[in-house]
Amino acid sequence: MKMTQTVKKVVVAYSGGLDTSVILPWLQENYDNCEIVAFVADVGQGAEELEGIEAKALASGASECYVVDLKDELVENYIYPTLKTGAVYEGTYLLGTSMARPIIAKAQVEIARKVGADALCHGCTGKGNDQIRFESCFAALAPELTVIAPWRIWDLTSRESLLEYLAERDIPTAASATKIYSRDANAWHISHEGGELEDPWNQPSKQVWTMTVDPIDAPNEPEFLTISVVKGEITAVNGEAMSPYNTLMYLNEKAAAHGVGRVDIVENRLVGMKSRGCYETPGGTVMVEALRGIEELVLDKTTRKWKQTVAAEFSHLVYDGRWFTPLCASLLAAAGTLAEEMNGEVIVKMYKGSVQAIQKKSPNSLYSEEFATFGDDNVYDQSHAEGFIRLYSLSSRIKALASK
């Protein structure tokens, strides 16, 4: 299937997994005289995933392989800003895969410019969200570059056909037909899809989960952490200041040991279909709960309602791959303004799969025990409520009278 399109040099987003292992030789065979450069994004997927990846890329057809450490930038410039908005997609998904795509696309474009490439290539399938996320970022950052999406071109249609393709060319791979789950990992989370999970009536087996302890097997005693928050950002745990990345790693370790952060959801993909995924986001779940605790104290009713609107809009923006847009900048600016008052400390309790903000305080707290008390009250005249209620319910009263 020789391509008629002329491409001189292409940068491939390379993971070393089955799909991208096939893409390198496929490009070599189907694009004449095209130099292939592999780009590997280290977003915290783990040392095991990266071990030997440069040698593997070169052996599979790449002329060069760039491994770029993006872990700190991912947490500081993508995860922390998203946390500040409060974004949670469809009320459950903490956007682990979605947040990583724009930084990977951005770094891929930077490598392309560095090596003088005229094309970009990704290994996303034609059924998923990631093809849209990557290509939307490419369009915003490098509209002049050609984009190659092999899954929308080639005649390889299954995992088995990819394995056969590599076997015919004596290209080694750790993948096998029995490794049935599709997984995506970074510093924030790991996702699991495929296999028996494709039937939502099937309960996830124990082998699905890889990052967190089964809540049943978690410690029988709870663990407590004190989370410090400054302007909507977590700055310290138990009084120890850490970088955003190190904070996340610490909370991942602590929360995973208690089985915190597991979700099993059916989500609406951008391409129109529903998909089922199991996600593990231990540290992130603790962070979201801690920030929610501060938010409850410091934002008044109408401001919090607006914050929830920002959160919902931003969750769809990130999920849909629209990071490099004016809307993203606007929503981040709004979240930054709202976060000015989000300062304080929260004590969270982790126990057998759950995390709760059980104590909270803030110098900007709007909570007044004097006004809220059910005991003796000298600051609030309860008789004042009568006039408010009559005005508040006036439209209902008028409608009822008019219908008589």
Swiss-Prot record:
Q: Which UniProt keywords apply?
A: Amino-acid biosynthesis, Arginine biosynthesis, ATP-binding, Cytoplasm, Ligase, Nucleotide-binding
Q: Where does ATP bind?
A: A13, Y14, S15, G16, G17, L18, D19, T20, S21, A41, G123
User: Which positions, given as ranges, span the membrane?
Assistant: none
The first-level EC class reads ligase
Q: Name one GO molecular function term.
A: ATP binding
Q: Which domain of life is it from?
A: Bacteria
What main location does UniProt list? Answer: cytoplasm
PROSITE patterns given for it? ARGININOSUCCIN_SYN_1, ARGININOSUCCIN_SYN_2
Please give the GO cellular component terms listed in this UniProt entry.
cytoplasm
GO biological process: one example: argininosuccinate metabolic process
Q: Which InterPro entries match?
A: Arginosuc_syn_C, Arginosuc_syn_N, Arginosuc_synth, Arginosuc_synth_CS, Arginosuc_synth_type_1_subfam, AS_cat/multimer_dom_body, Rossmann-like_a/b/a_fold
Instruction: Give the catalytic activity.
Output: L-citrulline + L-aspartate + ATP = 2-(N(omega)-L-arginino)succinate + AMP + diphosphate + H(+)
**What's its EC?**
6.3.4.5
Q: Provide the residue positions that the database annotates as binding L-citrulline.
A: Y93, S98, N129, R133, S182, S191, E267, Y279
Q: Which residues participate in L-aspartate binding?
A: T125, N129, D130
Quick one: which pathway? Amino-acid biosynthesis; L-arginine biosynthesis; L-arginine from L-ornithine and carbamoyl phosphate: step 2/3
Compartment(s) where it occurs, according to its Swiss-Prot or TrEMBL record: Cytoplasm
Q: How does it assemble?
A: Homotetramer.
Q: Which family does it belong to?
A: Belongs to the argininosuccinate synthase family. Type 1 subfamily.
| Identification of the protein by name | Argininosuccinate synthase
Q: Which organism is it from?
A: Moritella profunda
Q: What is the lineage of its organism?
A: Bacteria, Pseudomonadati, Pseudomonadota, Gammaproteobacteria, Alteromonadales
Q: Which gene encodes it?
A: argG
